[in-house]
Amino acid sequence: MKFNSHIENLPIYEAGKPIELVIREFGIDQNDIIKLASNENPLGTSKKVIEKIKNVAQNSSLYPDDSYYELKDGLSNLYKVEPKNVIIGSGSDQIIEFALHAKANEKKGILVSGVTFAMYEIYAKHVGAKIYKTKSKEHNLAEFREIYRTNKNDISVIFLCLPNNPLGECLDADEVFSFIKDVSEDTLVVIDGAYMEFAKFKSSKKEIDPKTLIQTFSNALYLGTFSKAYGLGGMRVGYGIANEEIIKALHRLRAPFNITTLSLAAAIEALKDNDFLKETLENNFKEMKVYEEFAKENSIEFIESYTNFITFIFDQHQNATKICDNLLKQGIILRNLKSYSMNAIRITIGKNEQNRRVLDMLKKEI
């Protein structure tokens, strides 16, 4: 069978290894496996959400309310925006896909940081768009400005991942707003706030308020997700917030019922459980200090993280791939950043006992 020729050259996103695969490959008992590779919530899912899912499970034969009225209402109350300014996606990456189908093409490219979330580039290539990247791995707005100034007519979408995955750094909000002021109103600026709950908990200077963003800039799209801080990675629920014109355009690309009945109920309930969110954030930054101290004691380079992970960058004397492979055989799943052309490992911040075991075993490898 023949397929469209461009399909052969499309990159595939490298996700963290699932626990099930490690069990099959190495015969390790599930209870002995620690997965800190995919930035999932180590506290799991809110008990209130689990109870809600159980109660709604009997309705699994029914399609969800495709207006997502109650979820949009909850997000509207949280961010003080109108429901008409919100779109729901099967993970925020689906809305990234919508945005690129709406704005990018073979003549209109995208601008991203040197090292950032891979799906921007992958979805851009789906529509044949050219990728413009900064030389700096971290977000460098001076480079963004220069590349945009030089290629303004050829760039239709700019992605700012704040905080940035997989490095963890985060720009101050005032820097971001200052940058967007210089961007044409016909260029879509996407603020990917998948980890924003963590960033604003650590520093108010990093918080990008969606209401202020879309009131100030008609060309801005804010993305959020329930996969990280809210502990619903397996439910696949994300959202976008923008002015009504952008939301209407994205809705034209959305298939009906793009999240499930159970996912919808889980997200609605998750928004109500502030205690679980608070516990998640407190555990994260308490345990983050353990990793930072380990890195300092062992002369490992790391970038200050405003997320739920930390990235260790190794010098030429260490091999991140070898370290990850050796730990994997012992049931420790971490994220090798080889696919980003980095000799580095990204580690999700787990619970105390998980972190201690991981660092004890990592110590033996370095």
UniProtKB/Swiss-Prot annotation:
Modified residues (N6-(pyridoxal phosphate)lysine): 228
Listed Pfam families: Aminotran_1_2 (PF00155)
Organism: Campylobacter fetus subsp. fetus (strain 82-40)
Xref: InterPro entries: Aminotrans_II_pyridoxalP_BS, Aminotransferase_I/II_large, HisP_aminotrans, HistidinolP_aminotransfase, PyrdxlP-dep_Trfase, PyrdxlP-dep_Trfase_major, PyrdxlP-dep_Trfase_small
Top-level taxon of origin: Bacteria
Signal peptide: none
Keywords: Amino-acid biosynthesis, Aminotransferase, Histidine biosynthesis, Pyridoxal phosphate, Transferase
Assembly behavior: Homodimer.
Cofactor: pyridoxal 5'-phosphate
Pathway entry: Amino-acid biosynthesis; L-histidine biosynthesis; L-histidine from 5-phospho-alpha-D-ribose 1-diphosphate: step 7/9
GO BP term, pick one: L-histidine biosynthetic process
Protein name: Histidinol-phosphate aminotransferase
EC number: 2.6.1.9
